[in-house]
Amino acid sequence: MVAGHLREKKGYFYAVLNYTDAHGNRKTKWIATGLAVKGNKKRAEAFLQEQRRSFQEDVPITGDVLFADFMEQWLTVIKSSVAVTTFASYSNMVKKVIVPYFRERQIALQELSAKHIQDFYLKELERVSASSVIHYHANIHKALKYAVKLDLIASNPADKIERPKKERFMANFYDADEVNRLFEISKGTKLEIPILFGAFYGMRRSETLGMKWDAIDFERDTITIRHTLTTVALDGKRITVAEDRTKNKSSMRTLPLVPFVKERLLELKAEQEENRRLCGRSYVKDYTGYVCINEIGDIIKPNYVSCGFPKLLEEHGLRRVRYHDLRHSCASLLLANGVPMKQIQEWLGHSDFSTTANIYAHLEYSSKVISADAMLAGLGIGNRE
């Protein structure tokens, strides 16, 4: 097993592996853990040991390598340069979908053509959405771009592909009565705060579970979204990833802490302090400072929210929606009450205005009514019937 140790860099743990290659040269490899230094020493140590056990030295690549093998090699190259959550997503797509297809066909990297890739996309479109195929394309294109950079192939065959068009997304959402009913039935449950954050503030699941008490200012009445928590599947295991980063820069935002949310959070804070006192040494210390924890201090897992939410709806006879649809419900209620699209973009933390407009433009009916009335007035035809 190779030697290794943990290093701290910009507030995060990195696993540093030291080994000697086939030519006798000493090498060092840095691997991002995605774990913040504070409160994650044990998890970082476990990550380091797993990396030491599973480490394999990179084998030089040549143009006659199978495309399937090249894709796997590309994963090892990018592992230390992308976030853990990003790598987990790439790894699952490559290992579970792309590699099995191309390995079965034994196509060499230098023999790979645009038609080979196009045939793969057409095959996949028989079972998955266009959005999924677009993600596959992004991985294949990046990997082949790297192959061009290494002079293994002259050009990128993925450049010649006709990508499938992404389907227009039609958001599902609750109206005001349904949201109020949801607040009512979730009160006192483990899902109460995730539902409150999702429906009122439009938070993503990772933002909700990553919320910490130090991001809530009870004096200035603000709540700041700046930390995320999620779980990812990587190498056959599910790992929890906590990061002092959000989906994009715009996602890091400060919103008003309204009275009814403030009151409930203060109650919850007192409940957690009492639970900590009652549990004593049995209380879980790993997630101290997080808002969404259970009675013994353990974090509420993302999967619990995703699975428990529809069960709660079914138990109380509410229409089935996903947890993420609470974010859409928040946007639709803001639109219905005259909030401009630009302000909704900032509230939700979208990176650009077009994202907000593309998702919610079909809901903005009130602005179309105003436009129709303006046309009628301009033409002197009179008011709408």
Where do the PLM segments sit?
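Short N-terminal "domain-start" leader segments
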Residues: 1-10
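N-terminal DNA-binding module of tyrosine recombinases/phage integrases
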Residues: 9-12, 19-115, 268-287, 365
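N-terminal core-binding DNA-recognition domain of tyrosine site-specific recombinases/integrases
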Residues: 37-40, 75-152, 168, 299-304, ...
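Short functional hotspots where side chains directly engage DNA or cofactors
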Residues: 108, 159-160, 220-226, 322, ...
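Short, basic (Lys/Arg/His-rich) helix/loop patches that form interaction surfaces
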Residues: 127, 180, 184, 188-191, ...
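Basic, Lys/Arg- and aromatic-enriched nucleic-acid-binding interface segment
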Residues: 134, 149, 153-155, 159-213, ...
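DNA/chromatin major-groove-contacting recognition/catalytic segments
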Residues: 181, 185-187, 234-241, 337, ...
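C-terminal secondary-structure termini that scaffold catalytic or DNA-interacting sites
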Residues: 220, 231-252, 259-261, 267, ...
